Amino acid sequence: TALVEEARDLGLSFDAYQGDSLANKYRFIDQFSVVSGVSKGCINVITGEFEGHPVTLFDYYYVTKENSVWWWAPSWEQHCYFSFIILDMESDFPELTIAKEGFLSKIAQAVGYRDIDFESHAFSQRYVVRSKDKKFAYDFCNAKMIDYLLDQPILNIELQKHALALVFDDQHELGRTRSHLRRVSKMRSLMPNYLFDPQPSEA
């Protein structure tokens, strides 16, 4: 298929189906907390290294089932999809979400973090940023990162533990793999080096 060829051109591996294994591996990503359904799984899985970083891309589907309030009407199913582009980093970090208004609203309500304001009015107008660690949010959303994100299409970003993820509310769009991988790789490069320095242990 075209997606197989796209993965091959990037030197990456493709697997059509991996069950729920990747969702379990990345269960800490909050997007999974709003998923419920009678059937779930990871499809169109692409893995490997891109610009020196381990990366994983996949579509996650789940099926919801509704019973009719009328005895004579059949039940119906709805197939829902998210797609993830994940870069695995060498250090763990606090949870941080950067997204357009409404995209992660259910997550925000569950987590309860307040919006973080930035000096850049354009950035604050475009994105809702939430984290329990405000200092880390400012370190990540430094001036170069803000300039870069303002120059990109609106993205939905979640960073937690070792995963830097782009999240989309539909299946992966063919032909966008390379550009999405370049985005997560660029964001990783714009993170200050000191964030990856070993933290001194408490006495």
Predicted region positions:
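Charged, low-complexity intrinsically disordered regions
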Residues: 3-203
